[in-house]
A protein has these predicted regions:
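Intrinsically disordered, low-complexity segments enriched in small polar residues
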Residues: 3-7, 17-18
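Cross-family detector of peptidyl-prolyl cis-trans isomerase
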Residues: 12-149
Length: 149
């Protein structure tokens, strides 16, 4: 399903803890699966692994997340809040993070876990980031929404 924001696919899971989605330990670092042998996506893709039941992340609110990020090209982790032992907070829709995060976290509910695949144009583009993320890299994140204020 395409939209003007470039989202081509949104998959929804059943609510957390239901019979079709086993209760996960949301206080553990998730695995991030990066497709192998497939070309990278050029659209934002959102896959809800767990649908939260709490407050919704909307533009203008401050969100608190835990996340793991990997590069599509090599499957290597480049960042994870879990490894630092602290969550990350930012103002949603305020341009404090890459566009793919602003668009990808919006609509999540507290307690949710979402895989967000971000094309270069919504990530770091041709410049890359700090020698850790290469130019024109597609990024794959698993994000847990911890809180909304």
């Amino acid at each position: 399903m395409a939209s003007s924001s470039g989202v081509v696919r949104v998959r929804m899971a059943a609510p957390y803890g239901t019979a079709t989605v086993p209760a996960m330990t949301m206080n553990e670092k998730p695995e991030v699966d990066v497709p192998t042998g497939e070309p990278p996506t050029y659209h934002l893709e959102l896959d809800d692994i767990v649908v939260g039941a709490g407050d919704e992340a909307v533009a203008g609110r401050t969100v608190e997340v835990h996340y793991v990020g990997k590069a599509w090209s090599n499957g290597e982790q480049f960042d994870a809040s879990w490894d630092r032992g602290s969550t990350f907070k930012f103002g949603l829709g305020k341009g404090q993070v890459i566009q793919g995060w602003d668009q990808g976290v919006a609509g999540m509910k507290v307690g949710g876990r979402r895989r967000i695949t971000i094309p270069p144009m919504l990530g770091y583009g041709k410049r890359g980031a700090g020698g850790v993320i290469g130019p024109d890299e597609t990024l794959v994140f698993v994000v847990d929404l911890i809180g909304v204020k």
